[in-house]
Amino acid sequence: MELSTAFDTILSDLAGGASILWLALAGVVLIVWDIFRNNAPVLPWLACLVVAGAAIIEVFRLGDPSSTVFFSLIQTGGPASFVSLVILISAFCSIVLSVPYLARIKHGYGEVYALILFATSGMVMLGTANNMVTVFVGLETMSIALYILTGLVRSDEGAMESALKYFLLGAFSTGFFLYGIALMYGATGTMYFTEMASGYAGSELQPLFWVGVALFLVGFLFKVAAVPFHMWTPDIYQGAPTTLTGFMATASKTAAFAALVLVLYHGIGTLAPGDGQWQLALALVALVTVVMGNILALNQDNVKRMLAYSSIAHAGYVLIALAAGTSEAYAGAVYYLLIYALMNIGAFGVMALLEWDGKEGRVQTLDSLSGIGFKKPLLGVTRGVFMFSLTGFPPLGGFFGKLAVFAPAVNAGLTWLAIVGVLASVFSGYYYLRVLYVFWMKSPDADDSAARSADFSVPRTSSIVIVGCAVLLLVIGLVPGLRDLTLSFFAQGGLAALP
Protein backbone atom coordinates (compact mmCIF):
# COMPACT_ATOMS: atom_id res chain seq x y z
CA MET A 1 0.00 0.00 0.00
CA GLU A 2 2.81 2.41 0.91
CA LEU A 3 4.63 1.55 -2.31
CA SER A 4 1.47 2.21 -4.30
CA THR A 5 0.98 5.54 -2.55
CA ALA A 6 4.58 6.55 -3.23
CA PHE A 7 4.21 5.59 -6.89
CA ASP A 8 1.02 7.65 -7.19
CA THR A 9 2.79 10.61 -5.57
CA ILE A 10 5.68 10.37 -8.03
CA LEU A 11 3.30 10.27 -10.99
CA SER A 12 1.36 13.22 -9.58
CA ASP A 13 4.57 15.21 -9.13
CA LEU A 14 5.78 14.42 -12.64
CA ALA A 15 2.42 15.46 -14.07
CA GLY A 16 2.41 18.67 -12.04
CA GLY A 17 5.92 19.62 -13.15
CA ALA A 18 5.44 18.39 -16.72
CA SER A 19 5.92 21.79 -18.36
CA ILE A 20 9.24 22.46 -16.63
CA LEU A 21 10.58 18.96 -17.26
CA TRP A 22 9.34 18.93 -20.86
CA LEU A 23 11.09 22.21 -21.69
CA ALA A 24 14.37 21.22 -20.03
CA LEU A 25 14.53 17.75 -21.62
CA ALA A 26 13.63 19.16 -25.02
CA GLY A 27 16.50 21.63 -24.69
CA VAL A 28 18.91 18.73 -24.18
CA VAL A 29 17.45 16.91 -27.19
CA LEU A 30 17.88 19.98 -29.40
CA ILE A 31 21.55 20.27 -28.42
CA VAL A 32 22.17 16.61 -29.29
CA TRP A 33 20.25 17.05 -32.56
CA ASP A 34 22.38 20.07 -33.45
CA ILE A 35 25.60 18.13 -32.83
CA PHE A 36 24.74 15.67 -35.60
CA ARG A 37 22.85 18.08 -37.88
CA ASN A 38 24.58 21.40 -37.47
CA ASN A 39 22.30 24.43 -37.93
CA ALA A 40 19.39 22.25 -39.01
CA PRO A 41 16.59 24.57 -40.23
CA VAL A 42 14.00 22.45 -38.45
CA LEU A 43 15.36 23.26 -34.96
CA PRO A 44 13.44 26.50 -34.32
CA TRP A 45 10.17 24.90 -35.38
CA LEU A 46 10.82 21.92 -33.10
CA ALA A 47 11.39 24.43 -30.30
CA CYS A 48 8.07 26.09 -31.19
CA LEU A 49 6.30 22.71 -30.98
CA VAL A 50 7.86 22.09 -27.57
CA VAL A 51 6.73 25.46 -26.24
CA ALA A 52 3.27 24.99 -27.77
CA GLY A 53 3.00 21.59 -26.09
CA ALA A 54 3.87 23.10 -22.71
CA ALA A 55 1.31 25.85 -23.31
CA ILE A 56 -1.41 23.29 -24.08
CA ILE A 57 -0.64 21.55 -20.78
CA GLU A 58 -1.06 24.83 -18.90
CA VAL A 59 -4.29 25.71 -20.75
CA PHE A 60 -5.91 22.52 -19.50
CA ARG A 61 -4.76 23.34 -15.97
CA LEU A 62 -6.24 26.83 -15.84
CA GLY A 63 -9.49 25.58 -14.33
CA ASP A 64 -7.79 23.29 -11.81
CA PRO A 65 -7.60 24.30 -8.14
CA SER A 66 -4.19 25.52 -7.04
CA SER A 67 -1.99 22.79 -5.60
CA THR A 68 1.67 22.00 -5.02
CA VAL A 69 3.98 19.21 -6.23
CA PHE A 70 7.50 17.96 -5.51
CA PHE A 71 7.25 18.35 -1.73
CA SER A 72 5.36 21.64 -2.14
CA LEU A 73 8.29 23.22 -3.99
CA ILE A 74 6.27 24.15 -7.09
CA GLN A 75 2.71 25.39 -7.56
CA THR A 76 0.45 24.17 -10.32
CA GLY A 77 -2.99 25.02 -11.65
CA GLY A 78 -4.94 28.27 -11.41
CA PRO A 79 -2.82 31.45 -11.41
CA ALA A 80 0.43 29.47 -11.66
CA SER A 81 -0.76 28.14 -15.01
CA PHE A 82 -1.74 31.64 -16.13
CA VAL A 83 1.73 32.99 -15.36
CA SER A 84 3.29 30.02 -17.15
CA LEU A 85 1.13 30.74 -20.19
CA VAL A 86 2.31 34.36 -20.37
CA ILE A 87 5.93 33.18 -20.24
CA LEU A 88 5.33 30.47 -22.86
CA ILE A 89 3.56 32.89 -25.21
CA SER A 90 6.54 35.24 -24.95
CA ALA A 91 8.95 32.40 -25.67
CA PHE A 92 6.94 31.12 -28.64
CA CYS A 93 6.68 34.55 -30.25
CA SER A 94 10.38 35.25 -29.64
CA ILE A 95 11.41 32.01 -31.34
CA VAL A 96 9.22 32.72 -34.38
CA LEU A 97 10.57 36.27 -34.67
CA SER A 98 14.16 35.07 -34.20
CA VAL A 99 14.20 32.70 -37.18
CA PRO A 100 14.42 35.31 -39.99
CA TYR A 101 16.31 37.78 -37.82
CA LEU A 102 19.13 35.39 -36.89
CA ALA A 103 19.26 34.11 -40.47
CA ARG A 104 19.81 37.66 -41.74
CA ILE A 105 22.63 38.32 -39.32
CA LYS A 106 24.06 34.83 -40.00
CA HIS A 107 23.90 33.70 -36.39
CA GLY A 108 21.17 31.09 -36.54
CA TYR A 109 23.02 28.68 -34.28
CA GLY A 110 21.13 25.60 -33.15
CA GLU A 111 22.04 26.11 -29.51
CA VAL A 112 20.12 29.40 -29.49
CA TYR A 113 16.81 27.59 -29.39
CA ALA A 114 18.00 25.12 -26.77
CA LEU A 115 19.08 28.04 -24.59
CA ILE A 116 15.67 29.68 -25.04
CA LEU A 117 14.05 26.44 -23.86
CA PHE A 118 16.37 26.25 -20.84
CA ALA A 119 15.65 29.87 -19.99
CA THR A 120 11.92 29.30 -20.37
CA SER A 121 12.09 26.25 -18.11
CA GLY A 122 13.79 28.35 -15.44
CA MET A 123 11.25 31.14 -15.88
CA VAL A 124 8.30 28.78 -15.44
CA MET A 125 9.93 27.34 -12.33
CA LEU A 126 10.58 30.83 -10.97
CA GLY A 127 7.06 32.06 -11.70
CA THR A 128 5.42 29.05 -10.02
CA ALA A 129 7.76 28.64 -7.04
CA ASN A 130 6.53 27.98 -3.51
CA ASN A 131 9.92 27.79 -1.82
CA MET A 132 13.01 30.00 -1.73
CA VAL A 133 15.22 27.18 -3.03
CA THR A 134 12.96 26.79 -6.06
CA VAL A 135 13.10 30.55 -6.60
CA PHE A 136 16.90 30.45 -6.62
CA VAL A 137 17.18 27.44 -8.95
CA GLY A 138 14.67 28.92 -11.39
CA LEU A 139 16.31 32.33 -11.25
CA GLU A 140 19.78 31.01 -12.00
CA THR A 141 18.61 28.62 -14.72
CA MET A 142 16.97 31.58 -16.42
CA SER A 143 19.86 33.97 -15.86
CA ILE A 144 22.70 31.73 -17.06
CA ALA A 145 20.90 31.03 -20.33
CA LEU A 146 20.21 34.75 -20.81
CA TYR A 147 23.86 35.66 -20.17
CA ILE A 148 24.88 33.40 -23.05
CA LEU A 149 22.12 34.62 -25.37
CA THR A 150 23.14 38.24 -24.75
CA GLY A 151 26.62 37.53 -26.13
CA LEU A 152 25.34 35.47 -29.05
CA VAL A 153 26.95 37.63 -31.76
CA ARG A 154 30.54 36.98 -30.81
CA SER A 155 31.93 39.22 -33.55
CA ASP A 156 30.05 42.22 -32.09
CA GLU A 157 32.14 43.94 -29.41
CA GLY A 158 29.04 45.67 -28.07
CA ALA A 159 27.26 42.35 -27.59
CA MET A 160 30.25 40.81 -25.80
CA GLU A 161 30.57 43.85 -23.55
CA SER A 162 26.86 43.65 -22.74
CA ALA A 163 27.09 39.95 -21.91
CA LEU A 164 30.05 40.52 -19.58
CA LYS A 165 28.29 43.39 -17.80
CA TYR A 166 25.13 41.34 -17.46
CA PHE A 167 27.02 38.36 -16.05
CA LEU A 168 29.10 40.32 -13.53
CA LEU A 169 26.23 42.48 -12.27
CA GLY A 170 23.89 39.49 -12.25
CA ALA A 171 26.34 37.48 -10.15
CA PHE A 172 26.72 40.43 -7.79
CA SER A 173 22.95 40.73 -7.32
CA THR A 174 22.68 36.98 -6.78
CA GLY A 175 25.02 37.35 -3.81
CA PHE A 176 22.60 39.80 -2.18
CA PHE A 177 19.70 37.52 -3.02
CA LEU A 178 21.31 34.43 -1.49
CA TYR A 179 22.46 36.22 1.63
CA GLY A 180 18.94 37.56 2.09
CA ILE A 181 17.44 34.08 1.79
CA ALA A 182 19.96 32.75 4.32
CA LEU A 183 19.03 35.41 6.88
CA MET A 184 15.30 34.89 6.32
CA TYR A 185 15.74 31.16 6.80
CA GLY A 186 17.85 31.68 9.91
CA ALA A 187 15.15 33.88 11.45
CA THR A 188 12.11 31.74 10.57
CA GLY A 189 13.48 28.22 10.15
CA THR A 190 11.64 27.69 6.86
CA MET A 191 12.09 28.23 3.14
CA TYR A 192 8.39 27.95 2.32
CA PHE A 193 6.47 31.18 1.68
CA THR A 194 3.34 30.00 3.46
CA GLU A 195 5.21 29.01 6.64
CA MET A 196 7.08 32.27 7.12
CA ALA A 197 4.36 33.85 9.25
CA SER A 198 4.36 31.05 11.84
CA GLY A 199 8.16 30.89 11.88
CA TYR A 200 8.40 34.66 12.26
CA ALA A 201 5.88 34.78 15.14
CA GLY A 202 7.97 32.50 17.34
CA SER A 203 11.35 33.88 16.32
CA GLU A 204 13.72 35.86 18.53
CA LEU A 205 15.54 37.09 15.42
CA GLN A 206 12.84 39.25 13.84
CA PRO A 207 15.18 42.21 13.10
CA LEU A 208 17.50 39.78 11.31
CA PHE A 209 14.57 38.64 9.18
CA TRP A 210 13.92 42.17 7.92
CA VAL A 211 17.60 42.61 7.06
CA GLY A 212 17.24 39.45 5.00
CA VAL A 213 14.10 40.84 3.34
CA ALA A 214 16.01 43.99 2.36
CA LEU A 215 18.84 41.98 0.78
CA PHE A 216 16.34 39.67 -0.92
CA LEU A 217 14.54 42.64 -2.46
CA VAL A 218 17.84 44.13 -3.68
CA GLY A 219 18.48 40.96 -5.66
CA PHE A 220 14.97 40.86 -7.07
CA LEU A 221 14.81 44.56 -7.91
CA PHE A 222 17.96 44.09 -9.99
CA LYS A 223 16.28 41.32 -11.99
CA VAL A 224 13.24 43.51 -12.76
CA ALA A 225 15.43 46.57 -13.53
CA ALA A 226 14.01 48.84 -10.83
CA VAL A 227 15.84 52.03 -9.84
CA PRO A 228 18.53 52.25 -8.48
CA PHE A 229 19.47 48.80 -9.81
CA HIS A 230 18.64 49.60 -13.43
CA MET A 231 21.80 50.87 -15.08
CA TRP A 232 22.63 47.55 -16.74
CA THR A 233 19.40 47.52 -18.74
CA PRO A 234 20.11 49.96 -21.65
CA ASP A 235 23.50 48.45 -22.48
CA ILE A 236 22.21 44.87 -22.37
CA TYR A 237 19.11 45.68 -24.43
CA GLN A 238 21.19 47.53 -27.03
CA GLY A 239 23.90 44.89 -27.32
CA ALA A 240 21.78 41.74 -27.41
CA PRO A 241 20.04 40.51 -30.59
CA THR A 242 16.75 42.39 -30.79
CA THR A 243 14.34 39.45 -30.77
CA LEU A 244 16.15 37.99 -27.77
CA THR A 245 16.03 41.39 -26.10
CA GLY A 246 12.25 41.23 -26.45
CA PHE A 247 12.32 37.79 -24.82
CA MET A 248 14.36 39.10 -21.91
CA ALA A 249 12.19 42.19 -21.52
CA THR A 250 8.95 40.22 -21.33
CA ALA A 251 9.32 36.62 -20.18
CA SER A 252 12.06 37.15 -17.59
CA LYS A 253 10.32 40.17 -16.08
CA THR A 254 7.02 38.27 -15.93
CA ALA A 255 8.66 35.38 -14.10
CA ALA A 256 10.53 37.60 -11.64
CA PHE A 257 7.49 39.72 -10.81
CA ALA A 258 5.27 36.64 -10.47
CA ALA A 259 7.70 35.16 -7.95
CA LEU A 260 7.82 38.46 -6.08
CA VAL A 261 4.00 38.54 -5.97
CA LEU A 262 3.95 35.06 -4.43
CA VAL A 263 6.59 35.91 -1.84
CA LEU A 264 4.77 39.09 -0.84
CA TYR A 265 1.28 37.59 -0.87
CA HIS A 266 2.08 34.45 1.11
CA GLY A 267 5.18 35.46 3.02
CA ILE A 268 6.41 38.97 3.72
CA GLY A 269 3.06 40.67 3.18
CA THR A 270 1.35 38.58 5.88
CA LEU A 271 3.82 39.39 8.64
CA ALA A 272 3.26 43.04 9.43
CA PRO A 273 -0.03 44.11 7.84
CA GLY A 274 -0.51 46.97 10.28
CA ASP A 275 3.04 48.23 10.04
CA GLY A 276 3.29 48.96 6.35
CA GLN A 277 7.00 49.85 6.36
CA TRP A 278 7.85 47.36 3.63
CA GLN A 279 4.96 48.75 1.58
CA LEU A 280 6.26 52.28 2.00
CA ALA A 281 9.71 51.13 0.88
CA LEU A 282 8.23 49.51 -2.24
CA ALA A 283 6.15 52.64 -2.89
CA LEU A 284 9.25 54.83 -2.82
CA VAL A 285 11.12 52.46 -5.14
CA ALA A 286 8.11 52.48 -7.48
CA LEU A 287 8.00 56.28 -7.42
CA VAL A 288 11.68 56.70 -8.28
CA THR A 289 11.55 53.93 -10.90
CA VAL A 290 8.56 55.42 -12.74
CA VAL A 291 9.97 58.95 -12.72
CA MET A 292 13.57 58.08 -13.62
CA GLY A 293 12.62 55.55 -16.29
CA ASN A 294 10.49 58.08 -18.15
CA ILE A 295 12.95 60.96 -17.77
CA LEU A 296 15.88 58.91 -19.04
CA ALA A 297 13.85 57.70 -22.04
CA LEU A 298 13.07 61.25 -23.17
CA ASN A 299 16.21 62.12 -25.14
CA GLN A 300 17.15 58.67 -26.41
CA ASP A 301 17.82 58.59 -30.14
CA ASN A 302 18.50 54.86 -30.15
CA VAL A 303 15.14 53.06 -30.21
CA LYS A 304 16.36 50.02 -28.29
CA ARG A 305 17.74 52.18 -25.50
CA MET A 306 14.48 54.10 -25.43
CA LEU A 307 12.55 50.84 -25.03
CA ALA A 308 15.01 49.78 -22.32
CA TYR A 309 14.33 52.88 -20.23
CA SER A 310 10.64 52.45 -21.02
CA SER A 311 10.78 48.94 -19.55
CA ILE A 312 12.25 50.41 -16.37
CA ALA A 313 9.26 52.75 -16.11
CA HIS A 314 6.86 49.85 -16.65
CA ALA A 315 8.57 47.93 -13.85
CA GLY A 316 7.68 50.91 -11.69
CA TYR A 317 4.01 50.63 -12.69
CA VAL A 318 3.94 47.00 -11.53
CA LEU A 319 5.68 47.98 -8.28
CA ILE A 320 2.87 50.49 -7.64
CA ALA A 321 0.45 47.56 -7.47
CA LEU A 322 2.79 45.51 -5.27
CA ALA A 323 3.14 48.43 -2.87
CA ALA A 324 -0.66 48.44 -2.42
CA GLY A 325 -0.34 44.95 -0.98
CA THR A 326 -3.91 43.72 -1.55
CA SER A 327 -5.25 40.69 -3.40
CA GLU A 328 -6.81 43.04 -5.96
CA ALA A 329 -3.45 44.76 -6.47
CA TYR A 330 -1.54 41.50 -6.95
CA ALA A 331 -4.17 40.37 -9.47
CA GLY A 332 -3.77 43.68 -11.30
CA ALA A 333 0.02 43.27 -11.37
CA VAL A 334 -0.16 39.83 -12.99
CA TYR A 335 -2.77 41.07 -15.47
CA TYR A 336 -0.52 44.01 -16.35
CA LEU A 337 2.35 41.61 -17.05
CA LEU A 338 0.24 39.94 -19.75
CA ILE A 339 -0.46 43.31 -21.40
CA TYR A 340 3.18 44.34 -21.03
CA ALA A 341 4.34 41.14 -22.73
CA LEU A 342 2.09 41.69 -25.75
CA MET A 343 3.15 45.33 -26.13
CA ASN A 344 6.87 44.67 -25.94
CA ILE A 345 6.95 41.50 -28.02
CA GLY A 346 5.32 43.49 -30.79
CA ALA A 347 7.49 46.58 -30.32
CA PHE A 348 10.75 44.61 -30.36
CA GLY A 349 9.45 42.44 -33.21
CA VAL A 350 8.91 45.48 -35.42
CA MET A 351 12.33 46.80 -34.43
CA ALA A 352 13.95 43.48 -35.34
CA LEU A 353 12.46 43.61 -38.84
CA LEU A 354 13.70 47.16 -39.37
CA GLU A 355 17.05 46.88 -37.64
CA TRP A 356 18.75 44.81 -40.32
CA ASP A 357 17.91 45.87 -43.83
CA GLY A 358 19.89 43.24 -45.70
CA LYS A 359 22.79 45.63 -46.32
CA GLU A 360 25.66 46.81 -44.18
CA GLY A 361 23.79 49.39 -42.15
CA ARG A 362 22.18 48.70 -38.82
CA VAL A 363 18.93 50.61 -38.37
CA GLN A 364 18.50 51.55 -34.70
CA THR A 365 18.23 55.32 -34.52
CA LEU A 366 15.03 57.30 -34.91
CA ASP A 367 16.30 59.22 -37.95
CA SER A 368 17.03 56.00 -39.79
CA LEU A 369 13.32 55.11 -39.54
CA SER A 370 12.06 58.31 -41.17
CA GLY A 371 9.05 57.77 -43.42
CA ILE A 372 9.10 53.99 -43.05
CA GLY A 373 5.39 53.94 -42.15
CA PHE A 374 4.35 54.68 -45.73
CA LYS A 375 6.85 52.24 -47.19
CA LYS A 376 5.80 49.41 -44.86
CA PRO A 377 2.23 50.20 -43.73
CA LEU A 378 1.86 46.94 -41.81
CA LEU A 379 4.82 47.78 -39.61
CA GLY A 380 3.75 51.40 -39.33
CA VAL A 381 0.20 50.61 -38.21
CA THR A 382 1.18 47.89 -35.74
CA ARG A 383 3.96 50.09 -34.40
CA GLY A 384 1.29 52.71 -33.77
CA VAL A 385 -0.84 50.23 -31.82
CA PHE A 386 2.12 49.27 -29.63
CA MET A 387 3.23 52.84 -28.98
CA PHE A 388 -0.29 54.04 -28.14
CA SER A 389 -0.80 51.04 -25.87
CA LEU A 390 2.52 51.59 -24.09
CA THR A 391 1.45 55.19 -23.49
CA GLY A 392 -1.88 54.03 -22.09
CA PHE A 393 -4.38 55.32 -24.63
CA PRO A 394 -7.89 53.83 -24.43
CA PRO A 395 -9.35 51.53 -25.63
CA LEU A 396 -6.09 49.59 -26.02
CA GLY A 397 -4.93 46.99 -23.53
CA GLY A 398 -2.25 49.27 -22.11
CA PHE A 399 -4.91 51.62 -20.74
CA PHE A 400 -6.76 48.86 -18.90
CA GLY A 401 -3.50 47.34 -17.69
CA LYS A 402 -2.51 50.61 -16.05
CA LEU A 403 -6.02 50.99 -14.65
CA ALA A 404 -5.62 47.55 -13.08
CA VAL A 405 -2.49 48.64 -11.19
CA PHE A 406 -3.45 52.23 -10.35
CA ALA A 407 -6.98 51.58 -9.03
CA PRO A 408 -5.87 49.19 -6.23
CA ALA A 409 -3.23 51.73 -5.19
CA VAL A 410 -5.95 54.36 -4.75
CA ASN A 411 -8.10 51.90 -2.79
CA ALA A 412 -5.12 51.12 -0.54
CA GLY A 413 -4.54 54.79 0.32
CA LEU A 414 -1.66 55.33 -2.11
CA THR A 415 -3.51 57.94 -4.17
CA TRP A 416 -0.38 60.11 -4.39
CA LEU A 417 1.53 57.23 -5.96
CA ALA A 418 -1.25 56.49 -8.45
CA ILE A 419 -1.31 60.17 -9.46
CA VAL A 420 2.44 60.07 -10.10
CA GLY A 421 1.91 56.97 -12.23
CA VAL A 422 -0.81 58.66 -14.29
CA LEU A 423 1.29 61.81 -14.80
CA ALA A 424 4.29 59.69 -15.79
CA SER A 425 2.16 57.84 -18.34
CA VAL A 426 1.08 61.15 -19.88
CA PHE A 427 4.71 62.29 -19.82
CA SER A 428 5.79 59.10 -21.63
CA GLY A 429 3.55 60.01 -24.56
CA TYR A 430 6.25 62.40 -25.77
CA TYR A 431 8.88 59.79 -26.56
CA TYR A 432 6.43 57.09 -27.65
CA LEU A 433 4.58 59.38 -30.06
CA ARG A 434 7.89 60.79 -31.30
CA VAL A 435 8.54 57.36 -32.79
CA LEU A 436 5.25 57.54 -34.68
CA TYR A 437 6.05 61.06 -35.85
CA VAL A 438 9.31 59.81 -37.36
CA PHE A 439 7.56 56.76 -38.84
CA TRP A 440 4.78 58.66 -40.57
CA MET A 441 5.54 62.37 -40.82
CA LYS A 442 9.28 62.85 -41.17
CA SER A 443 10.80 62.70 -44.63
CA PRO A 444 13.91 60.53 -44.86
CA ASP A 445 17.25 62.04 -45.80
CA ALA A 446 18.99 60.73 -48.86
CA ASP A 447 21.63 58.91 -46.83
CA ASP A 448 19.24 57.24 -44.38
CA SER A 449 19.30 53.45 -44.28
CA ALA A 450 15.52 53.26 -44.49
CA ALA A 451 15.53 55.49 -47.55
CA ARG A 452 18.17 53.35 -49.25
CA SER A 453 16.42 50.04 -48.65
CA ALA A 454 12.66 50.09 -48.39
CA ASP A 455 12.27 46.94 -50.43
CA PHE A 456 13.03 44.35 -47.74
CA SER A 457 10.30 41.77 -47.33
CA VAL A 458 8.46 41.11 -44.08
CA PRO A 459 8.42 37.35 -43.35
CA ARG A 460 4.91 35.94 -43.09
CA THR A 461 5.59 34.26 -39.75
CA SER A 462 6.82 37.53 -38.26
CA SER A 463 3.78 39.35 -39.64
CA ILE A 464 1.44 36.86 -37.96
CA VAL A 465 3.11 37.33 -34.57
CA ILE A 466 3.20 41.12 -34.76
CA VAL A 467 -0.37 41.46 -36.03
CA GLY A 468 -1.53 38.90 -33.47
CA CYS A 469 -0.07 40.94 -30.60
CA ALA A 470 -1.69 44.12 -31.94
CA VAL A 471 -5.09 42.42 -32.34
CA LEU A 472 -4.95 40.97 -28.83
CA LEU A 473 -4.27 44.43 -27.40
CA LEU A 474 -7.36 45.69 -29.20
CA VAL A 475 -9.50 42.72 -28.14
CA ILE A 476 -8.49 43.04 -24.50
CA GLY A 477 -9.44 46.69 -24.58
CA LEU A 478 -12.66 46.39 -26.57
CA VAL A 479 -13.97 43.28 -24.78
CA PRO A 480 -14.10 44.32 -21.12
CA GLY A 481 -15.63 41.00 -20.12
CA LEU A 482 -12.32 39.26 -20.89
CA ARG A 483 -10.43 41.75 -18.73
CA ASP A 484 -12.90 41.45 -15.85
CA LEU A 485 -12.83 37.66 -16.06
CA THR A 486 -9.04 37.61 -15.83
CA LEU A 487 -8.95 39.96 -12.85
CA SER A 488 -11.71 38.11 -10.99
CA PHE A 489 -9.93 34.82 -11.65
CA PHE A 490 -6.93 36.08 -9.71
CA ALA A 491 -8.61 38.17 -7.05
CA GLN A 492 -11.25 35.59 -6.12
CA GLY A 493 -10.56 32.16 -7.54
CA GLY A 494 -6.84 32.46 -8.06
CA LEU A 495 -4.53 34.06 -5.53
CA ALA A 496 -7.02 33.66 -2.72
CA ALA A 497 -7.13 29.91 -3.35
CA LEU A 498 -3.40 29.31 -3.25
CA PRO A 499 -2.21 26.95 -0.50
Residue locations for each model-derived region?
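Alpha-helical transmembrane segments of multi-pass membrane proteins predominantly involved
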Residues: 1-499
